[in-house]
From Swiss-Prot:
The modification Pentaglycyl murein peptidoglycan amidated threonine is found at T841. It is found in: Secreted, Cell wall. One of its GO terms (biological process) is cell adhesion. Cell surface-associated protein implicated in virulence by promoting bacterial attachment to both alpha- and beta-chains of human fibrinogen and inducing the formation of bacterial clumps. Partly responsible for mediating bacterial attachment to the highly keratinized squamous epithelial cells from the nasal cavity via an interaction with cytokeratin K10 (K10). Also promotes bacterial attachment to cultured keratinocytes, possibly through an interaction with cytokeratin K10. Binds mouse cytokeratin K10. Activates human platelet aggregation. A motif (LPXTG sorting signal) lies at residues 838-842. Its main location: secreted. It comes from Staphylococcus aureus (strain NCTC 8325 / PS 47). Proteolytically cleaved by aureolysin (aur). This cleavage leads to the inactivation of ClfB. InterPro entries: Adhesin_Fg-bd_dom_2, Adhesion_dom_sf, Fibrogen-bd_dom1, LPXTG_anchor, SDr-like, SDR_Ig, YSIRK_signal_dom. Residues 44-192, 530-849 are annotated as: Disordered. Residues 44-61, 68-95, 120-189, 805-816 have a biased composition (Polar residues). The lineage of its organism: Bacteria, Bacillati, Bacillota, Bacilli, Bacillales. Residues 96-119 have a biased composition (Low complexity). This is Clumping factor B.
Length: 877
C-alpha cells in the first residue's frame, strides 16, 4: 500500500515553525525585559540628576518660597547649647542709590505668653539723594516700643551716613506699599517679618538635690497632653506638656521621680546653661497652702527632669499633683522642618507623640537679582551664670546671589541703643565667619556646627575687614560676593534688665553697574517661658486620733488626646502548595487493536480525568456483522494513575483494513515527552490512514520512553511534540505482534467516537500497538478526540471480539485490581450483564469448552497469519 510521505514532512515543517515561533517569542520577551529595565535605569538616573539640579537651582534661585517640610535629619554633633524660641523681626530697605541717611520702620508684637504674629509685607518711601557707596553707613534704630501686649507698635531701622541728614523710611506693617525713589526708576518691593518677643526673666528656684530613692515605681502619671503638636520655633513657637501624677505608696523627703524628653525636644529652649553645670531650675510644685511639695530641675545634657519631694510628704498619703512645663525644639537634633518622634517618659511610663516643626525659612531678602538678603537668630542666651553671654547665627547672602560692594552690620540694638541690653564691641564680641559649600544643606533651625564639612572657616580673611567704628555696631566688609556665608556671633549683654535686642543689616549694589543699591534688615529678640505645678496630699491617718490634713485642691485634668489605633497589618496570602507531579510511568500496553468490526458506537466517553484504573474490559462481544449497537459508553471517570492494565486481548479476527482516520486529536497536553521509540516495524500495510494527528503538545518532559515496539507500519506520524518533562518512563514494550490478519472484511463503521476527555496530566504513552494489519477498510472514523489531557491512559480496550458473542460466566469474570479503593465500573457492567443474560438452556461446560477452544485456535491462527504477512512485508521492503 502507498505510504503518505508528505505527512512526515508536513509535521517536520510544523515543528520547525513552532520552534521558530518559540525562538521569536524568546527574542521579543528578552528585548522587552532588556529595554524595559534599561529605561527604568535611565529614569532613575534622570531623576537623580533632576534632584541634584533642583537642589542647585533652589540654592541659587531668588524665590523665597522655601517652605517644604523635609525629612528629619538628626545632627549628632555634640552641642549642648540649649534652645529657646527666639523671635525675629525683619525689615528690608531697597533703593537705587545709597542715601546719606535712611530709616526703616517695622512692627513688632511683644507678648509674654503665647501669641504669634504673621509676617506682613511693608514698603519704603525713599527720598534720599545719591551718595557714594564707599561712605560706610551704619543702619541704626530710630525709635522702638515693646509693650508686652498683643498689639503691634512701630519699630524702625535707621541708616546713617556719618549720622547726618537722616531721612525717614516709613515701614507701616498693616499694608503693602511701594518705594518712592526721587532719583531712581525702579520700585522694588520690601518685606518685613514680624515676630513677637519677650523679655528675659530671672531664674525661679535653685536646683534641687536628689539624695533619696528613685520612686518611679510608686508614681503613676495620667492625663498627659501636649498643648499643640505643630509650631514654628523661629517665630518663638513652643508647646507645653501637662500631666497629673499620683503617689501610690508612702514616700519620704529626698525621694524623687523623673521625666525624660526625646531628642527632638528640649526644656530650656534657647537659654544657655552650659556655664551653670548644664542644670536648669524649674518652678516648685506647691500645695494649695503654698507649701513646697517638690523641687524640680532639668538636666540639659540628659534632657531629664527630676522632681525631689520635700519633708511635706513625710506624713502624707494619697499625694496627687500636676505640672505644666514648656517644651522647645532642639535646633541641633531637629535641624529641618518636618515631623519628629516626641515620646516622653514620665515615671518610667512612655507617652508616645509626634511633633511637627514648621520653621520659617532662613532664606529671605529682596526679590530681585541683586537684592540684599540676610537673616539671623539668637540661639542661646546665658541667663543663669552671671556671665551674660549670648550666641547668634547670621546667614549672609543665603540666596547665593552675585552682589557687589556688600556690607553687613551686626548691631546690639534695634531702634535705640538705650533700649537694649546688647553689647557689641571689639572686646565684647567674637565673630567667626564660614563660607558655605552647599547652601541647600543649611539648616532651617539656624543651627550651624563649626565642625561641619559643609562649612569652611574664612575668619582670617576678614581680619582687616571688621570694624567697630560706631557704637554697638560691628561692620563687616564682604565686598563682591557670589557665595553664602555663616557668621557665628558670641556676644554679651549688660545687667540693666532690658530686653536683649539685636539687628543685622546687609547692603550692596549691582556689581555690573555699581548702582541699584539694596538694603535688607532683620531683628531678633529672645523669649523665656517658665512652667510650674501644684500638688496636695492627705495626712497620715491615726485610727485613734485622726488628724485631718489640708483639703486637696482639685485640678481640672486636661482631656488626653486619643491615641491613634494602629492599622492591622495585612496577613500575607498563603502561597499555594504545588500539586505533585504524577508519576506517569504508565506501562499502558494500550493495544488498541480495536478491530471494532461492529457498529459498536462505543462512545466510550471515558473522561479519564484521574487515576482510575480504567480497566474497562468492556468486552463488547459484538459479532462482527452484527450491528450490535453496544453503546458501551463506559463513562469511566477513571480518575486513576491510569494503571490501565487493559488486558485487551484484541483477537479481532477482523481484517480491519481500518482506514481509521483516527484523528485522535488527543491534545494530550500531558506534558508527556513521549519519545515513543515506537519501532513500529510492523510491515503491516495497515494503510490505516490513521491520520493520528495526535498533536498532543504534551509539553510535559515525561520521558515516556515508551519503547513500544509496536511493529505497526501504520504511518501514524504522531508528531506529538510531546515535550512533556513528566518522566513517564512508560517502557511499555508492547511488542504485541498480534498478527491480527483477520481478513474479516468487517466494514464496520464503528464510529467509536470515544471522546474520552481524559483531561488530566495524562502521560498518554498510548503505546497503541496499533498493529492494525487489518485490511479492514472499515472507514471507522474513530474521531477519538480523546483530549487525553490527563494521566488516565484510558485504555478503553473494547475487546470487540467479534464473531465470538461469548458471554463469560459470572464466576469467571476477573475483577481488575483496584489498589486505591475506587469504584470499579467493570464490576458494575458484569453485574448488569449477569442480570440481563438470557436463560441458560444448554450444557454450560460444553459450550464454554468449545468456545475457549475455538478462541484459542482463532488466536493462534491470527498470530501465525500476522507474522507471515509481516515477514512478507519485510521481504518486499
Amino acid at each position: 500500500m502507498k505510504k503518505r510521505i508528505d505527512y512526515l514532512s508536513n509535521k517536520q515543517n510544523k515543528y520547525s515553525i513552532r520552534r521558530f515561533t518559540v525562538g521569536t517569542t524568546s527574542v521579543i520577551v528578552g528585548a522587552t525585559i532588556l529595554f524595559g529595565i534599561g529605561n527604568h535605569q535611565a529614569q532613575a538616573s534622570e531623576q537623580s540628576n533632576d534632584t541634584t539640579q533642583s537642589s542647585k537651582n533652589n540654592a541659587s534661585a531668588d524665590s523665597e518660597k522655601n517652605n517644604m517640610i523635609e525629612t528629619p535629619q538628626l545632627n549628632t554633633t555634640a552641642n549642648d547649647t540649649s534652645d529657646i524660641s527666639a523671635n525675629t523681626n525683619s525689615a528690608n530697605v531697597d533703593s537705587t542709590t545709597k542715601p546719606m541717611s535712611t530709616q526703616t520702620s517695622n512692627t513688632t508684637t511683644t507678648e509674654p505668653a503665647s501669641t504669634n504674629e504673621t509676617p506682613q509685607p511693608t514698603a519704603i518711601k525713599n527720598q534720599a539723594t545719591a551718595a557714594k557707596m564707599q561712605d560706610q553707613t551704619v543702619p541704626q534704630e530710630a525709635n522702638s516700643q515693646v509693650d508686652n501686649k498683643t498689639t503691634n507698635d512701630a519699630n524702625s531701622i535707621a541708616t546713617n551716613s556719618e549720622l547726618k541728614n537722616s531721612q525717614t523710611l516709613d515701614l507701616p506693617q498693616s499694608s503693602p506699599q511701594t518705594i518712592s525713589n526721587a532719583q531712581g526708576t525702579s520700585k522694588p518691593s520690601v518685606r518685613t517679618r514680624a515676630v513677637r518677643s519677650l523679655a528675659v526673666a530671672e531664674p525661679v528656684v535653685n536646683a534641687a538635690d536628689a539624695k533619696g530613692t528613685n520612686v518611679n515605681d510608686k508614681v503613676t502619671a495620667s492625663n498627659f497632653k501636649l498643648e499643640k503638636t505643630t509650631f514654628d520655633p523661629n517665630q518663638s513657637g513652643n508647646t507645653f506638656m501637662a500631666a497629673n501624677f499620683t503617689v501610690t505608696d508612702k514616700v519620704k523627703s529626698g525621694d524623687y521621680f523623673t521625666a525624660k524628653l526625646p531628642d527632638s525636644l528640649t526644656g530650656n529652649g534657647d537659654v544657655d546653661y552650659s556655664n551653670s553645670n548644664n542644670t536648669m531650675p524649674i518652678a516648685d510644685i506647691k500645695s494649695t497652702n503654698g507649701d513646697v511639695v517638690a523641687k524640680a530641675t532639668y538636666d540639659i545634657l540628659t534632657k531629664t527632669y527630676t522632681f525631689v519631694f520635700t519633708d511635706y510628704v513625710n506624713n502624707k498619703e494619697n499625694i496627687n499633683g500636676q505640672f505644666s512645663l514648656p517644651l522647645f525644639t532642639d535646633r541641633a537634633k531637629a535641624p529641618k522642618s518636618g515631623t519628629y518622634d516626641a515620646n516622653i517618659n514620665i515615671a518610667d511610663e512612655m507617652f508616645n507623640n509626634k511633633i511637627t516643626y514648621n520653621y520659617s525659612s532662613p532664606i529671605a531678602g529682596i526679590d530681585k537679582p541683586n537684592g540684599a538678603n540676610i537673616s539671623s537668630q539668637i540661639i542661646g542666651v546665658d541667663t543663669a551664670s552671671g556671665q551674660n553671654t549670648y550666641k547668634q547665627t547670621v546667614f549672609v547672602n543665603p540666596k547665593q546671589r552675585v552682589l557687589g560692594n556688600t556690607w553687613v552690620y551686626i548691631k546690639g540694638y534695634q531702634d535705640k541703643i538705650e533700649e537694649s541690653s546688647g553689647k557689641v564691641s571689639a572686646t565684647d564680641t567674637k565673630l567667626r565667619i564660614f563660607e558655605v559649600n552647599d547652601t541647600s544643606k543649611l539648616s532651617d533651625s539656624y543651627y550651624a556646627d563649626p565642625n561641619d564639612s559643609n562649612l569652611k572657616e574664612v575668619t582670617d580673611q576678614f581680619k582687616n575687614r571688621i570694624y567697630y567704628e560706631h557704637p554697638n555696631v560691628a561692620s563687616i566688609k564682604f565686598g563682591d560676593i557670589t557665595k553664602t556665608y555663616v557668621v557665628l556671633v558670641e556676644g554679651h549683654y549688660d545687667n540693666t534688665g532690658k530686653n536683649l535686642k539685636t539687628q543685622v543689616i546687609q547692603e550692596n549694589v549691582d556689581p555690573v553697574t555699581n548702582r541699584d543699591y539694596s538694603i535688607f534688615g532683620w531683628n531678633n529678640e529672645n523669649v523665656v517661658r517658665y512652667g510650674g505645678g501644684s500638688a496636695d496630699g492627705d495626712s497620715a491617718v491615726n485610727p485613734k486620733d485622726p488628724t485631718p490634713g489640708p483639703p486637696v485642691d482639685p485640678e481640672p485634668s486636661p482631656d488626653p488626646e486619643p491615641e491613634p489605633t494602629p492599622d492591622p497589618e495585612p496577613s500575607p496570602d498563603p502561597e499555594p502548595e504545588p500539586s505533585p507531579d504524577p508519576d506517569p510511568d504508565s506501562d499502558s500496553d494500550s493495544d488498541s487493536g480495536s478491530d471494532s468490526d461492529s457498529g459498536s458506537d462505543s462512545d466510550s466517553e471515558s473522561d479519564s480525568d484521574s487515576d482510575s484504573d480504567s480497566d474497562s474490559d468492556s468486552d463488547s462481544d459484538s459479532e462482527s456483522d452484527s450491528d450490535s449497537e453496544s453503546d458501551s459508553e463506559s463513562d469511566s471517570d477513571s480518575d486513576s494513575d491510569s494503571d490501565s492494565d487493559s488486558d485487551s486481548d484484541s483477537d479481532s479476527d477482523s481484517d480491519s483494513d481500518s482506514d481509521s482516520d483516527s484523528d485522535s486529536d488527543s491534545d494530550s497536553d500531558s506534558d508527556s515527552d513521549s519519545d515513543s521509540d515506537s519501532d513500529s516495524d510492523s510491515d503491516s500495510d495497515s494503510d490505516s490512514d490513521s491520520d493520528s494527528d495526535s498533536d498532543s503538545d504534551s509539553d510535559s518532559d515525561s520521558d515516556s520512553d515508551s519503547d513500544s515496539d509496536s511493529d505497526s507500519d501504520s504511518d501514524s506520524d504522531s508528531d506529538s511534540d510531546s515535550d512533556s518533562d513528566s518522566d513517564s518512563d512508560s517502557d511499555s514494550d508492547s511488542d504485541s505482534d498480534s498478527d491480527s490478519d483477520s481478513d474479516s472484511d468487517s466494514d464496520s463503521d464503528s464510529d467509536s467516537d470515544s471522546d474520552s476527555d481524559s483531561d488530566s496530566d495524562s502521560d498518554s504513552d498510548s503505546d497503541s500497538d496499533s498493529d492494525s494489519d487489518s485490511d479492514s477498510d472499515s472507514d471507522s472514523d474513530s474521531d477519538s478526540d480523546s483530549d487525553s489531557d490527563s494521566d488516565s491512559d484510558s485504555d478503553s480496550d473494547s475487546d470487540s471480539d467479534s464473531d465470538s458473542r461469548v458471554t463469560p460466566p459470572n464466576n469467571e469474570q476477573k475483577a481488575p485490581s483496584n489498589p486505591k479503593g475506587e469504584v470499579n465500573h467493570s464490576n458494575k457492567v458484569s453485574k448488569q450483564h449477569k442480570t440481563d443474560a438470557l436463560p441458560e438452556t444448554g450444557d454450560k461446560s460444553e459450550n464454554t469448552n468449545a468456545t475457549l477452544f475455538g478462541a484459542m485456535m482463532a488466536l493462534l491462527g491470527s498470530l501465525l497469519l500476522f507474522r507471515k504477512r509481516k515477514q512478507d512485508h519485510k521481504e518486499k521492503a
